[in-house]
Each structure stands twice: as C-alpha cells, then as structure tokens.
Swiss-Prot record:
InterPro entries, A to Z: Peptide_deformylase, Peptide_deformylase_sf
Catalytic activity of the protein: N-terminal N-formyl-L-methionyl-[peptide] + H2O = N-terminal L-methionyl-[peptide] + formate
Broad EC category: hydrolase
Protein name per the record: Peptide deformylase
GO biological process, one term: translation
GO function terms (MF aspect): metal ion binding; peptide deformylase activity
Residues where Fe cation binds: C92, H134, H138
E.C. number(s) listed in UniProt: 3.5.1.88
List of catalytic residues: E135
Superkingdom of source: Bacteria
Organism placement in taxonomy: Bacteria, Pseudomonadati, Pseudomonadota, Gammaproteobacteria, Enterobacterales
Length: 175
C-alpha cells in the first residue's frame, strides 16, 4: 500500500469527470487499498479517486476509522433521494481548512459495485448520505464550494491565496 498524491483546489484536474470502471482488476483493488491508506493518512472520512488524480468512478468511505466498516463504491449512482434537505458543515481533503454548510438530501439510495464486482443497493442516512453525495460530486467534477454563493466563494479564494502566500514564504525561509 502507498499514500497517493492529493490534488488541491484550484487544480483543474479536480474538475475532470471520472470514467466508469469496466473491469475490476488487481490494479483496481490496489487503487482502492492505496485510497484507503491515503484517506487515513489525511485524516478524512471519504475519498474519491479524482482527488488523487485517478479519474475512475471509485470512492472509499470510513466514517469511524474502523477497518470492518470500510465502504467501497465503484460506479456509484444515486437512484433516489428521500426526505428532507439537510445542511451539514462540510470540509474536503482537496480544499484544506475550508468548511461550509451545503444542502444535501438527508437520505439516499445508492446503487454501486463493491470491490469484488458485486452489484448492491444501500440506503444511506445522515452523515453517510452526505459523505456519499460529496464524494460522488467529485466523480462528476464538482466541489462542495460550487454550492456556495459567489460572495462566499470569493472569501474562500482570498483565504486560499493568503495561505498559499504564507506557505510559499515559509518554504523560502526554511531553505
């Protein structure tokens, strides 16, 4: 297993639409394993292949850092949104230090393949529902900030520019 290189906003590769996985091979399983390792290293609860510059429809989720409850979704598709819209504060490994309230369906039914190629459907609620929707958005080239107002996006850009300037200056000083 290895830790994969993350893509960070505003990298345009995050906007690339992922392609479906046609064959689940040994390479696919290695990607999944590496994605979990990367997600744990980054202290996340979900990761889409797009975030590590692999443009295949694969997401991994582990809400509780529990190897027995790890979830893999290959070619996931939300087939039904149920109930009310919820607003949960979201963050993203590809947009560090930024959090925002995003409208999401509280309950969904998702259809997918597992890591062995078996088709399954599951109902997801609350945080799991939000996480699946967030990660599927990545596969579609969308980011959670796309749901925000232009004013909020402008504020986020200012923060990112400030942090990248501080980071670049820190790198120069430490060399």
């Amino acid at each position: 297993m290895s830790i994969l290189q993350m893509l960070y906003y505003p990298d345009q590769r995050l906007r690339k639409i992922a392609r479906s996985v046609s064959i689940i091979s040994h390479d696919t399983k290695k990607i999944i394993s590496d994605m979990f390792e990367t997600m744990y290293f980054q202290q996340g609860i979900g990761l889409a292949a797009t975030q590590v510059d692999i443009h295949q429809k694969i997401i991994v989720i582990d809400l509780n850092n529990n190897i027995q409850k790890r979830l893999v979704f290959i070619n996931p598709c939300i087939i039904k949104k149920i109930g009310t819209i919820t607003h949960i504060i979201e963050g993203c490994l590809s947009i560090p230090k930024i959090r925002a309230s995003v409208p999401r369906s509280q309950n969904i039914i998702v259809q997918s393949l597992d890591e062995n190629g078996n088709n399954f459907e599951m109902e997801a609620t609350d945080l799991l529902s939000v996480c699946i929707q967030h990660e599927i958005d990545h596969l579609l080239g969308k980011l959670f900030i796309d749901y925000l107002s232009p004013f909020k996006i402008q504020r986020i850009h200012k923060k990112i520019n400030k942090w990248s300037t501080v980071y670049k200056n820190h790198i120069k000083l430490s060399h």
